[in-house]
Amino acid sequence: MDIEARLEYIIFENKANHYVVAGFSELKTYHNFTAAGRIEDPIEDQEYVLQGEYVKHPKYGEQFRVDMAKKKLPDNSDAIIHFLCGENFPTIGKKTAESIYETLGENCLEKIHNNPELLHEVPNLTAKKILIIQKGIQEFTGFNETYAKLLKYGLSPRQIQMLLDTYDNVLDVIEEDCFKPYYEVYGFGYKTACKMASAIGLSNEDPRRLDAYIYELARQLSMATGNTYITFATIFQNVRGVNESLIQESIDRLVSLQYLYVENTRIYPFTLHEDEVTIAKGLKNHLFEVESVDVESKIKQVEFSLAITYDQEQKDAIQLFFDRSFMILTGGPGTGKTTTVKGILEICKDVYPDSKIQLCAPTGRASKRLAQLSNCDSRTIHSLLQWNLEDNSFGKNEEDPLDVDFIIVDEFSMVDTHLFAQLLKALPQRCRILLIGDEDQLESVGPGKVLEDLIKSDVIDTVHLKKIFRQSSGSGIVTLAKEIREETTCHYEDGVEFIERTTPKIMDALIDYVKDMDLDSMQILAPMYKGAAGIDEINRQMQVLFNPKSPQKNQMKVGTTIFRENDKVMLLKNLPDEDVYNGDIGTIVEIDSKQNVISVDFTNTIVDFSTDFLYYLKHAWCISVHKSQGNEYQTVFCIVDVNAKNMLEKRLLYTAISRAKKQLFIIGNKSLFETQVRLKLKRIRQTSLQERINEVTEKIF
């Protein structure tokens, strides 16, 4: 869509990347609107031709998204002649301007802009003056030849902007290596780079194509397996039909460019190698002697004020926190981790009244839960580090560290290698650290097994809480979790019920049990998305059961999914500007079909999702076990489907059942469940973190 409009006022301008938000008035209709996008050197009262479309921003409402903007050229004779005699066109006088108009006629400037060769038709116009006119029109309109060329390469305006923000001489960079943006620009993917390479005419035999393929393979395998490195053998097995010597040459080139890193037989994506090194060095900086504080009397005061009694294991953990600069606290459900942390916080405020204590967790829901349980402020790690969604950078780092004396990180088993490296970079050197987690839960989605590697390095004091305290309703849940951890016989009692069903009967049993449940306190967990008992089908059936079609409720189809007012949904992307994050669950409160907007209430934070953002939502009556991590629910339904046998590993089942607080219903194949919880892990993540820690760090005590 093209709109001719006058720029009335500038709301915001980023001079570094030319991103502008401004108020415009359409020339034909006088319609006032807000536009946002790349506009070079915006001028108030200037007329522009804007190319783009109207969108609904999730926070700022309707606005025109500018894909391309250029100043509108004069279109009547007097204005054209006056324009060509102006400062943009040195040495072009009135007679030359009149000659151009007489030769090319009305809209001659637009004609020249679209086809500069027309200037050769003007009598007595020298080559030098032709160049002056071409350059002057381009500079005035803001039309960028680089931008135009990148459009021809099949790039979207957003992708072009990413390149322009990164490189001063984009075309030179691409001419040298059209895959360079793929390696260096966050969000510029492999498929986009391949498409651009084909548009440029890069030969299929060009070695740069093989380089990019091998790098993509290394990156994808790391994400799929959770490994921080892969082996040469794995590369050779996956790159078929290519001579091994050519593969080796490609790896050597990628290493020389610092896109890959090689140690013996291990090949790392360069950033993951850097992250492991950063963590090892960071730990060394945070392991230092502290002045010990005897807190025995303080513990008694906390026991009195909180009306609790700590066992010796918990008391030792609290004392250790005040004796060490770095500590890990682990334990299964019901072992008193939260109660122990409450005591640590109370005593810390008393002993160090001027100290700054920061609580955080990897997900929004885990952070909110930590805040509720501790009565202290807590933030997500991404929010704390001022994560930038656009370029995946962090505002807090070694150059601008956090102002904290103590940091406590909950649900640490979910933290991957890259995120922990960024957190350590942002901590001041004398900051003391407490990491809390359950080492038997699922590992992080991203590469690494950080909690396990830290514990096994044996350089950080670790307290394993073992005694179970939760003996009220639902005590059978923590008992079952303990039985799975210790690989003893499973019992299903005191809040735990196993409903044995074959896969075709799982759905009927689930519907029969959940139909009278309180939706706010119940969550269904399943291991996979597809199939008769998969997440997608369960959500379809739950929508029919809990939120059927009604004339009183608006609905909207997004792809193959129908969203309806009152639906339970989950956010699939981090939106730091809205303070909502991947995994947050909310309720659809309004659907505006005309504007293509879905409004979701995430616990008193309402976010509007427009066309470009609708795919960030997914139904959430049933979610994956990974997405549930960091959360607790009063009642959990855990699906054990034989079709998901390969996914039903011990860690996943343990994580699923430990999400329940009062009631746990396991539906499916009992024999499969009891077999899988005793199987040793089939896939052990490959990392070098433990080795690196032991190489550079010695235990202080």
Model-derived features with residue positions:
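Loop/turn positions that initiate beta-strands
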Residues: D45-V49, N566, G583
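ASCE P-loop NTPase helicase motor core
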Residues: K315-I318, D323-E493
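Pre-Walker A segment
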Residues: L131, V262-G332, L345
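C-terminal accessory regions
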Residues: D584-F701
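Short, charged beta-turn/beta-strand-edge "cap" motif at the junction between a beta-strand
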Residues: E53-P58, L572-E578, D641-A644
